[in-house]
Curated annotation (Swiss-Prot):
Enzyme class: transferase
Reaction catalyzed: RNA(n) + a ribonucleoside 5'-triphosphate = RNA(n+1) + diphosphate
Gene designation per UniProt: rpoC
Protein name stated in the entry: DNA-directed RNA polymerase subunit beta'
Organism, scientific name: Acinetobacter baumannii (strain ATCC 17978 / DSM 105126 / CIP 53.77 / LMG 1025 / NCDC KC755 / 5377)
Protein purpose: DNA-dependent RNA polymerase catalyzes the transcription of DNA into RNA using the four ribonucleoside triphosphates as substrates.
Signal peptide range in chain numbering: none
EC number annotated for this UniProt entry: 2.7.7.6
């Protein structure tokens, strides 16, 4: 390993040597010798520069003798000047004659008069010095800051090593024992103790000790110490180097002193901190020379320690040292951490030359790959190219002349500019760049004016609009950069969105409106019923006004269709269409059929059209087509004359009657409230309900009124036709506006919310057309302001989420074609509440099959494994009736670094199998983060009013089909129907092909009316249940007998006034008298065969049978009312996504069964129930204490499976991973994240979420090391463990046992192998301290590390460079081996020859 400083020096060799290539960077502790080897001399004085001459003081902090000359090739006293004396050292002032920039790299040093502990290794938790010495941080600090003595060598005295003595104890001991023992204080003492540690002996002692340790805390501490000691042993770091004897001094140009006008100076804080250290150090030296009293020396040493602490990390210990203006000084640690630190400000984000920015305006005449660049800007950006061209063509003799010409802007300069710009792409960027489409390349077209012109179709990708947005322009300089910009970043190559694989170059707003307008049809328009020979004839008729653009006519069209085999066929057909659609047909490329455009072109339809064009005809045709669509749309929107007027907002005539009716209902409820029939809460809920319903009714009336008009047709009868109302057309086409907005314009504004989120019960009955009263306006202002405040918060939070995601996934790159695994995820259609939300074809599209796909009906192989599923195959799968496919997934990928192409599948932005080197991690992070700002920030309070949907109480099917049970356990009731006794059962409905169309959850105790495999008609009811109670269902028949159910002790009888029926209700434990506290009420069934079955009754159970009654199988013997679910906050939107990715444990999460077995309840403790599970396999009994207020869903004697829910609540992802495995966890996280995005209508491919989950599952906890090198309790990379276990198994030894760990994204980012990446993310100090102590090597495998060290990244086109480096490295290693052997051979033969036998 070379020293980093040598590398830096090599880079700056003026002889033009190539920079040193390196493959890894190691960080470690610097020994005093090493610090001196870097140094060019000792800084002895605190002076900086002479304030009159501005020359640096000798031996001071800016000394030219140590750090180098201030001016290029000129010594300080001026004896030697110019290049010819290069390398001469002036005998007068001692300065070497060289370039001044060595002052940026030459370091100095300070010889400390007393050792000083490095604050990072002392105070950065856990304290490394403390761990090594096995002392507490407080004790060490007392020694370091001269409060106590520590025994470093006890000799023959009763003291122990590491024992602390205060002054009195020390002097008493001195009197008693004299110099038989040694005790010291300060950093010297700590340094001696560290020197004395025998790492080898300690390590072997700890290795023996760990297996015998019983206490958990001791074990943790011992294994931590062991890890640290081994790290020291392996890394060639010595523990005593954590205490410094020599302090390095930063090169002066990195802590500059700049003279300001008025004789003052601006200086870096570091100079103040160094001055403080030097002053105290010099004073200490003087005191030691004078043999000053101990107490004074001690104080000086303590002050020296404190000043070095402040220099390294100001404010970590005690109060931060402040400058003259009461602001804490910026120390070395502050220089590198945080957003303004070295990492994030200068290494990961740099400013670039050859860039400019300006306002953007719309460029409707541009082609998709073009942008308009103002001439002024282009002239400045392309200057070097222009200079070179002017010189080459002989128009200017020198660069200076060329410069003059450009400044004068002579005519020939413009000609040169035009030729330079031809075919030279520029990159446009709009901040915030949330995904890779925020930076795209275009060909510049020179324009007058000062604004950049942007093609309207790329606005969606940039999220740009023309209300004053600015964009930046960057010029790719090298040929390679130009090539990449053209081949990869050109806007024409980015038609599909990387997030979901759908077109992102889709017309919006005016274009959509124009296309929609010309493809509408109208009843009885001019020329209806005409027949045309071809589209040209239609054009002529339109131009001469013979036919209206919306008329219904017949036209003969020629179309080219691509058949099954990919061949093109010509067809001629006669179609019913309109002249407007014929206009559109003229721009549609060959290969698309006419019926794709023979309909109203809403935004959705246009998107579909572009998508199928891309899939069928490829990139080039799509780009041309998109441009043509845009030109046509703009032109026709202009000609349509669609505008917005007051008259367009039609208020429905029935509005007032609907509102009057609602007001009457509200009055009735008010009366009921006054008479005491309903409570205040109920009244409020009902009123809010009524108004919400009324608002919907008004909106419906308004939309009906707005969307249809009555017209006379040719026969003179009235016919309904879609309205040509401007506002309605805008909304219907998807150009602008939504039903909700039109409702506010022409319906009623409806209910408003108060600042705390509660709804104000009096709605705004007016709409914007009628106008609002002052009060109504005032009520509505709150929502508007909250919206603005929310947006600001949301942007920050969303950005932070994206940053964490990028950081955790940045090193995931496609590294190999196929890892060969057969693991993966089983994909089924995503069904929720009976609706197919995402069909199977959408979920498997672009994935690779993990095993053969077989048809459900005859088990025939439809698709072999390893096939990439495209649109065609997905359609075939659907036809074959396949309803689950096992596909490869990044979760199961077995590549060591990165993932393989087969596990990832299709590259969504390109539409084919992903290329090696594609940076899929960053793509995933951007795809999830980019829509973040569209998500809501609020947490919803779900209370009475908001949970408007009535609880489901039956399964009613929508489609005819066959009933399928999914893990449903049932018992047969006497009346003939089945009763469900399983908790996680589901019912599916399959169509005639065997594809599942619907799926419903089936609660415990539901009555099932059909059997598995029976047919059901559409609308048939399959199962019913009571949504408000939990039934207790008997699984055997017998006679009921009450046990420990005593009135007034454990139960209470209630008689219903209305019905006169008496019911027995079990009392809660808290409400029972003392005698009933320990009783466990139960119903015992004496079965017919003489056995007994106990049913223990939870608190609040309503018993529905009488003592001695005969009971059949499946009867309900008791009901537990479900607490009207407590108002609980549902976290929605962005915070929910963040919670999922941070793997946070939810409050009051669901309790799952840890093992499979029979449930029973043990002895209760105060406030908690004891749940006992007796496992099926006879292993040890599992017990858990559950708080009494938790509702427990299982009953005594019931059988549960591992991972089944015992008590409801939000799921805890860690439990899912532990009990159900990583596939179940992946499905849970993917579905939960998708729920949030779906609610906002954002489409993200599952793949992206899986990529992040893979990174969250990187680490495992070692439970038992076996014969591997891992220690129990250690955290290791999953892939590493798997590989080491395979190696160990091959030798027939014991592999390590481990448990997968789920880490939140922040923690996962920090636990990455690369310390550079972790340090530049968060907690810089902690990461660097840990890395330095353990002597970590960074292999520079991720993207971030390589950006920081300034190399090409190992992704995309940079991957080739890295693979080549790796290959060379492997070859060099092999070569070295051969060399060693040949040398040994030579030596051996020489020895043989020299011996005289």
């Amino acid at each position: 390993m070379k020293d980093l400083l040598d590398i830096m020096r090599k880079k700056t060799d003026s002889d033009g040597h190539a920079p040193v290539e390196f493959d890894r960077i190691r960080i470690g502790l610097a020994s005093p010798e090493m610090i001196k080897s870097w140094s060019h001399g000792e800084v002895k004085k605190p002076e900086t520069i002479n304030y009159r001459t501005f020359k640096p003081e000798r031996d001071g902090l800016f000394c030219a003798k140590i750090f180098g000359p201030v001016k290029d090739y000129e010594c300080l006293c001026g004896k030697y000047k110019r290049m010819k004396y290069k390398g001469v050292i002036c005998e007068k002032c001692g300065v070497e004659v060289t370039t001044a920039k060595v002052r940026r790299e030459r370091m100095g040093h300070i010889e400390l008069a007393s050792p000083v502990a490095h604050i990072w290794f002392l105070k950065s938790l856990p304290s490394r010095i403390g761990l090594l010495l096995d002392m507490t941080l407080r004790d060490i600090e007392r020694v370091l800051y001269f409060e106590s003595y520590v025994v470093t060598d006890p000799g023959m005295t009763p003291f122990e090593k590491y024992q602390l003595l205060n002054d009195e104890e020390y002097f008493t001991a001195l009197e008693e024992h004299g110099d038989e023992f040694v005790a010291k204080m300060g950093a010297e003492a700590v340094q001696d103790l560290l020197k004395d540690i025998d790492l080898e002996a300690e390590i072997s002692r700890l290795r023996e000790e760990i297996p015998q340790t019983t206490s958990e805390t001791k074990l943790k501490k011992a294994s931590k110490r062991l890890k640290l000691m081994e790290a020291f042993k392996d890394s060639n770091n010595k523990p005593e180097w954590m205490v410094m004897n020599v302090l390095p001094v930063l090169p002066p140009d990195l802590r500059p002193l700049v003279p300001l006008e008025g004789g003052r100076f601006a200086t870096s804080d570091l100079n103040d901190l160094y001055r403080r250290v030097i002053n105290r150090n010099n004073r200490l030296k003087r005191l030691l020379d004078l043999a000053a009293p101990d107490i004074i020396v001690r104080n000086e040493k303590r002050m020296l320690q404190e000043s070095v602490d402040a220099l390294l990390d100001n404010g970590r210990r005690g109060r931060a040292i402040t400058g003259s203006n009461k602001r804490p000084l910026k120390s070395l640690a502050d220089m590198i951490k945080g957003k303004q630190g070295r990492f994030r400000q200068n290494l990961l984000g740099k400013r670039v030359d050859y860039s400019g920015r300006s306002v953007i305006t719309v460029g409707p005449t541009l082609r998709l790959h073009q942008c308009g660049l103002p001439k002024k800007m282009a002239l400045e950006l392309f200057k070097p190219f222009i200079f070179a061209k002017l010189q080459a063509s002989g128009q200017a003799t020198t660069i200076k002349a060329a410069k003059k010409m450009v400044e004068r802007e002579t005519p020939e300069v413009w000609d040169v500019l035009a030729s330079v710009i031809r075919q030279h792409p520029v990159m446009l960027n709009r901040a915030p760049t949330l995904h890779r489409l925020g930076l795209q390349a275009f060909e510049p077209i020179l324009i007058e004016g000062k604004a950049i012109r942007l093609h309207p179709l790329v606005c969606a990708a940039f999220n740009a609009d023309f209300d004053g947005d600015q964009m930046a322009v960057h010029v790719p300089l090298t040929l390679e950069a130009q090539l990449e910009a053209r081949a990869l970043m050109m806007s024409t190559n980015n038609i599909l969105s990387p997030a979901n694989g759908e077109p992102i170059i889709v017309p919006s707003q005016d274009v959509v409106l124009g296309l929609y307008y010309i493809t509408r049809d109208a009843v009885n328009a001019k020329g209806e019923g005409m027949v045309f020979a071809d589209t040209h004839e239609v054009n002529r008729a339109l131009a001469t006004g013979q036919v209206a653009i919306h008329a219904r006519v017949k036209v003969r069209v020629h179309q080219t269709v691509i058949n099954e085999n990919g061949e093109r066929e010509q067809q001629t057909i006669i179609v019913d269409t309109t002249p407007g659609r014929c206009l559109l047909w003229e721009v549609v490329p060959e290969g698309l059929s006419f019926d794709m455009i023979n309909l109203e072109m809403t935004k959705k339809n246009i998107s579909k059209l572009i998508n199928s064009c891309y899939r069928k005809l490829g990139l080039k045709d799509t780009v041309i087509f998109a441009d043509q669509l845009m030109y046509l749309g703009f032109r026709q929107a202009t000609r349509s004359g669609v505008s917005v007027g007051m008259e367009d907002m039609l208020i429905p005539p029935t509005k007032h009657t609907i509102i009057d009716k609602a007001e009457t209902e509200v009055r009735e409820i008010e009366q009921q409230f006054e008479q005491g029939f309903v409570t205040a809460g109920e009244r409020y809920n009902k009123v809010v309900d009524i108004w919400a319903r009324t608002n919907d009714q008004v909106a419906k009336a308004m939309m009906d009124n707005l969307s249809y008009t009555l017209v006379k047709n040719k026969q003179g009868e009235d016919e309904k036709q879609k309205s040509f109302n401007s506002i309605y057309m805008m909304s219907d086409s998807g150009a602008r506006g939504s039903a909700a907005q039109i409702r506010q314009l022409a319906g009623m504004r409806g209910l408003m919310a108060k600042p705390d989120g509660s709804i104000i019960e009096t709605p705004i009955k007016a709409n914007f057309r009628e106008g609002l009263t002052v009060l109504q306006y005032f009520i509505s202002t709150h929502g508007a302001r909250k919206g603005l405040a929310d947006t600001a918060l949301k942007t920050a939070n969303s950005g932070y989420l994206t940053r964490r995601l990028v950081d955790v996934a940045q090193d995931l790159v496609i590294t190999e074609p196929d890892c060969g695994t057969s693991g993966g995820l089983v994909m089924t259609p995503f069904i929720q509440g009976g609706d197919v939300i995402e069909p199977l074809r959408d979920r498997v599209l672009g994935r690779v099959t993990a095993e053969d796909v077989r048809r459900a009906s005859d088990d025939e192989v439809v698709l072999p494994r390893g096939t990439l599923i495209d649109e065609k195959i997905a359609a075939q799968l659907e036809e074959a009736g396949v309803d689950e496919v096992k596909v490869r997934s990044v979760i199961a990928c077995e590549s060591t670094f990165g993932v393989c192409a087969k596990c990832y599948g299709r590259d969504l932005a390109r539409g084919h199998l992903v290329n090696p080197g594609e940076s899929v991690g960053v793509m995933a992070a951007q795809s999830i983060g980019e829509p973040g700002t569209q998500l809501t920030m609020r947490t919803f309070h779900v209370g009475g009013a908001a949970s408007r949907t009535s609880a489901a109480n039956s399964v009613q099917v929508r489609n005819k089909g066959t009933v399928r049970f999914h893990n449903v356990k049932t018992v047969q009731h006497a009346k003939g129907h089945l009763v469900s006794v399983s908790r996680s059962g589901e019912i599916g409905i399959a169509d005639e092909l065997g594809r599942e169309r619907e799926r419903y959850k089936l609660p415990y105790g539901a009555s099932i009316l059909l059997k598995d495999g029976e047919l059901v008609e559409a609308g048939g009811i399959v199962a019913t249940w009571d949504p408000h109670t939990h039934p207790l269902v008997t699984e055997v028949a017998g006679k009921a007998r009450f046990s420990q159910i005593a009135d007034g002790v454990t139960a209470t009888s209630k008689t219903d006034d209305a019905t006169g029926m008496t019911t027995v209700e079990i009392l809660p434990v808290t409400a029972r008298p003392a005698s009933g506290k320990d009783l466990r009420p139960a119903i015992v069934l004496d079965t017919t065969d003489g056995g007994e079955q106990f049913y223990f009754l939870p608190q609040n159970t309503i018993v529905t049978v009488r003592d001695g009654e005969t009971i059949g199988v499946g009867d309900v013997i008791g009901r537990v009312p479900q607490e009207s679910s407590r108002t609980r906050d549902i976290t929605g939107g962005l915070p929910r996504v963040a919670d999922l990715f941070e793997a946070r444990k939810p409050k009051e999460h669901a309790i799952l069964a840890e093992v499979s077995g029979i449930v029973s309840f043990g002895k209760e403790t105060k406030g908690k129930n004891r749940l006992v599970i007796t496992p099926d396999d006879g292993s040890e009994i599992y017990e858990e204490l559950i708080p009494k207020w938790r509702q427990i869903n299982v009953f005594e004697g019931e059988h549960v499976n591992r991972g089944e829910t015992i008590s409801d609540g939000p799921q805890n992802p860690h439990d899912i991973l532990r009990l159900k495995g990583e596939v179940a966890l992946t499905n849970y996280i993917v579905n939960e994240v998708q729920d949030v995005y779906r609610l906002q209508g954002v489409k993200i491919n599952d793949k992206h979420i899986e990529v992040i989950v893979r990174q969250m599952l990187r680490k495992v906890d070692i439970i038992d090391g076996g014969d591997t090198s891992f220690i129990k309790g250690e955290q290791v990379d999953y892939i590493r463990v798997v590989q080491e276990n395979q190696a160990v198994l091959a030798q027939n030894k014991f592999p390590a046992k481990f448990e997968r760990q789920l880490m939140g994204i922040t923690k996962a980012s920090l636990s990455t192998d690369s310390f550079i990446s972790a340090a530049s993310f968060q907690e810089t100090t902690r990461v660097l301290t840990e890395a330095a102590v353990t002597g970590k090597e960074d292999d520079l495998r991720g993207l971030k590390e390589n950006v920081v060290v300034g190399r090409l990244i190992p992704a995309g086109t940079g991957l080739a460079y890295h693979l080549e480096r790796r290959r060379q490295e492997a070859e060099a290693a092999e070569h070295a081996l051969h060399n060693d052997f040949s040398e040994v051979d030579q030596a051996f033969s020489q020895a043989l020859n020299s011996e005289q036998f």
